[in-house]
């Protein structure tokens, strides 16, 4: 389950069962309704234990929000999560396997949860807590495709290892980017190969939103995870080779080699433009109409992409039409 849906239960699921007469209680709060929330988690573990699972640990507030209010201290949050983890581990022992080392578990150190993990000079965080032994620590990017933290050499022996939660699509502030695949492959390569070198190798998750138009970036993310030796390479230029092979894989037999080269160019340049500025943050003042030829270069590049795509639109075979549009 996702980063904010612990013990195999979707957050929205609680809203379907909550109420004054529900055995789960009527508050998504481990402070005021610990018995109801515990029972809710127990039933989720029982329901899913026959399947292959990676159980999400921890807890966030309703609808993927902060678990406690703004008036609560860092210590309040950390103490609550310690208790949550203790209860969840005991539930897993009772319902799944008494040997926790045999149960795949993860906790996603996302947004404010990252602060709860590290703590500060006055308040020890969850780092090193025995309740996290055997739990994969899922680090995250900054919602915009840049990793926030990577494990230090001292941290890399954590039992349970490390994972990465990476955004190719993001709904939220300060600005969202959705619907259009805009992940720049060289940056994706840079961030994920660095994560791999720092020992983040147990779980990779990407928030992809809708798969349509994301196939290119998602394919590279998965292929890189599957075969780091092949696609890790020595520098980001290997993403150019990947693009060539990916275009060939999608359209081989539908277009000539010369035509495939033009389609590769269009996809690469389009991806590069989006790396500079995504659709959601584009406006008339981004590219200067005079200095450094910024606006002119973007216009010429855009016109070339449109020319290539329009040129082959009408000759694309029907069985490849869906792939061509995406």
Predicted segments with their positions:
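Short acidic, gly/pro-rich beta-turn/loop elements at beta-sheet edges
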Residues: 10-19, 67, 117, 148, ...
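Short, solvent-exposed turn/loop segments enriched in Gly/Ser/Thr/Pro and often Arg
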Residues: 4-9, 208-212
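Structured mid-domain segments that build the active-site/substrate or prosthetic-cofactor binding neighborhood
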Residues: 140-144, 151-320
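Gly/Pro-rich turn-and-neighbor structural signature
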Residues: 31-159, 265, 276-324
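Generic low-polarity alpha-helical segments
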Residues: 1-4, 138, 246, 325
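Active-site-adjacent "subsite" loops/lids of carbohydrate-active enzymes
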Residues: 5-42, 159-165
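Glycine- and acidic
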Residues: 22-27, 64-74, 169-178
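Catalytic domains of carbohydrate-active enzymes, especially glycoside hydrolases
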Residues: 1, 43, 47-52, 194-203
């Amino acid at each position: 389950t996702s980063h904010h849906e612990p013990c195999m239960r979707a957050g929205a699921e609680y809203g379907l069962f909550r109420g004054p007469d529900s055995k789960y209680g009527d508050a998504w709060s481990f402070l005021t309704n610990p018995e109801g929330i515990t029972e809710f988690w127990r039933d989720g573990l029982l329901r899913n234990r026959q399947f292959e699972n990676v159980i999400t640990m921890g807890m966030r507030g309703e609808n993927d929000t902060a678990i406690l209010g703004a008036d609560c201290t860092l210590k309040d949050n950390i103490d609550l999560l310690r208790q949550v983890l203790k209860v969840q581990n005991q539930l897993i022992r009772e319902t799944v396997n008494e040997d926790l080392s045999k149960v795949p578990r993860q906790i996603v150190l996302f947004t404010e949860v990252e602060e709860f993990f590290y703590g500060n000079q006055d308040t020890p965080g969850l780092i090193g807590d025995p309740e996290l032994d055997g739990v994969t620590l899922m680090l995250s990017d900054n919602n915009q495709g840049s990793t926030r933290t990577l494990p230090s050499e001292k941290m890399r022996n954590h039992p349970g290892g490390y994972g990465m939660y990476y955004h190719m699509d993001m709904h939220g502030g300060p600005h969202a980017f959705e619907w259009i695949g805009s992940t720049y492959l060289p940056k994706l390569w840079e961030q994920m190969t660095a994560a791999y070198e720092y020992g983040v190798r147990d779980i990779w998750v990407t928030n992809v939103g809708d798969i349509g138009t994301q196939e290119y970036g998602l394919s590279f993310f998965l292929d890189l995870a599957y075969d780091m030796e092949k696609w890790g390479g020595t520098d980001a230029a290997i993403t150019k080779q990947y693009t060539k092979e990916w275009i060939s894989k999608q359209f081989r037999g539908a277009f000539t080699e010369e035509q495939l080269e033009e389609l590769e160019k269009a996809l690469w340049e389009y991806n590069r433009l989006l790396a500079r500025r995504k659709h959601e943050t584009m406006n008339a003042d981004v590219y200067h109409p005079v200095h450094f030829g910024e606006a002119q270069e973007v216009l010429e590049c855009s016109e070339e992409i449109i020319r290539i795509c329009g040129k082959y639109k009408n000759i694309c075979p029907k069985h490849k039409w869906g792939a061509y549009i995406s």
